[in-house]
A protein has these predicted regions:
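Non-catalytic, well-ordered alpha-helical scaffold segments
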Residues: 63, 117-118, 155-159
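Long amphipathic alpha-helical segments with strong coiled-coil/leucine-zipper propensity
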Residues: 96-152
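Generic structural signal for hydrophobic core residues of well-folded globular domains
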Residues: 69, 73, 77, 115, ...
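Zn2+-dependent metallopeptidase catalytic core
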Residues: 1-23
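Residues that form generic nucleotide/phosphate-binding pockets
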Residues: 17, 123, 228-231
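Active-site scaffold of zinc-dependent metalloenzymes
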Residues: 25-65, 69-86, 245-252
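Post-HEXXH active-site segment of zinc metalloproteases
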Residues: 59, 74-112
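Pan-zinc metallopeptidase signature
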Residues: 133-252
Length: 252
């Protein structure tokens, strides 16, 4: 993965508002399709990787960039497990010896973990409610475009379905009355959302708010990941393990 250090302007205000005290560096990662964040507990640094579109038009993708900074804030205030997935040495070895097996298991963990964005967006909404409204509008427009183009394969991807569940959960969690009911939109186009996805939307909606007490919040994270993996019928047994100063994931 090639990346180049960049110095975007105007983001310091968001870092300051979030109270970030660890250095944040920004990197242009042309091969990335979306923005990405890596929080390193050992070096006490944050890296925010910007996709080409985010670098060229930061105002359009500001919700995503600030979202990544909120990941950094949770990493500092709770743990890096809320921003970056790390694995036990056992699974690091599997990644080298059995890359196919690791890739499949790691993807399942990511899908079971990605609702961490609910808590990230709780923090973003507290400071900048207009950004979640912008993000919801953009996401809804994207879904409508997929419908118009009959992109059924993209609509049925796990990432899209979990995004729909999160979108629906946040509509009610944050009282976003102007945010589109995408389940209804899909139904109007003859597409019925699976019960398990609707169930996940309800589950996400009622996720406990973080208390910013690491042990308790990590337990909430772990139990929710276990539950999502169960609902999605993934053959993994995710568990957070404290190793060498880091909370890392073991998959059984």
């Amino acid at each position: 993965m090639q990346k180049h250090k960049i110095y975007p302007s105007g983001l310091e205000q968001y870092e300051h508002a979030l109270g970030l005290y660890q250095p944040v560096s920004y990197w242009l990662a042309p091969e990335e399709q979306t923005c990405r964040v890596v929080c390193n507990l050992r070096s006490r640094t944050h890296e925010v990787w910007l996709s080409e579109p985010a670098y060229r038009s930061p105002e359009l993708l500001l919700p995503d960039i600030v979202h990544k900074l909120c990941h950094c804030a949770l990493a500092e205030r709770v743990d890096t497990a809320f921003s970056t997935i790390w694995f036990t040495e056992k699974w690091n070895q599997i990644s080298r010896k059995e890359p196919g097996r690791f890739s499949q298991s790691a993807r399942m963990l990511y899908l079971a973990w990605c609702h961490v964005d609910i808590w990230v967006n709780d923090l973003r909404h507290k400071h900048w409610p207009e950004l979640i409204a912008q993000e919801h509008s953009t996401f809804a427009q994207g879904v409508v475009i997929l419908l118009q183009r009959h992109e059924w394969g993209m609509l049925s991807r796990s990432e899209t379905l979990l995004g729909l569940a999160q979108h629906q959960a946040e509509r009610e969690r944050h009282g976003l009355s102007k945010s589109a009911d995408l389940f209804a939109v899909l139904s109007a186009h003859g597409i019925e959302v699976e019960k398990k996805i609707k169930g996940l939307a309800e589950f996400f909606k009622f996720l406990p708010r973080l208390r910013f007490k690491p042990r308790k919040d990590l337990k909430i994270l772990e139990s929710s990941v276990v539950e999502v993996a169960r609902r999605l019928e993934f053959p993994i047994s995710p568990k957070l393990v404290f190793k060498n100063g880091l909370w890392v994931w073991d998959l059984g």
